Amino acid sequence: MVCNKEVIQGNQLLEQSVELAAQIIELCRTIKPDVINSPIISQIVRSSSSVMANISEGSVSIFSQKERAYRFSISLREIEETMSWLLLMKRCMLIKQDIFAKLSEQCLSIKKMLFSSLKTLKASKSS
């Protein structure tokens, strides 16, 4: 995975995914780990970091358009999973409404950019 500062700064999708993963890690550090919370914490950290990792890999131009689209489609599934974990965390009162709203908005923004990127890749493939 190529993730140097220049690559991140030039890619809004990657920047936002790194920021989301970092914020979720910071949030999870504040939640008391126990037999119930630990699996939830583990899953949301895994899914949000997978979004970032797959966007990073999909952003590398040495891969084919098919491979890049595949990586972005994985990221799309992982962002959906991240949103589901956030919803569960809010419902179980592990996070406050304002934190849920902020992180959900970030997820939605990333989701929209992923849809747009996939649409562009598919359009250029058929050209």
Question: Which stretches of residues belong to each language-model region?
Answer:
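Amphipathic alpha-helical assembly/interaction segments
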Residues: 1-127
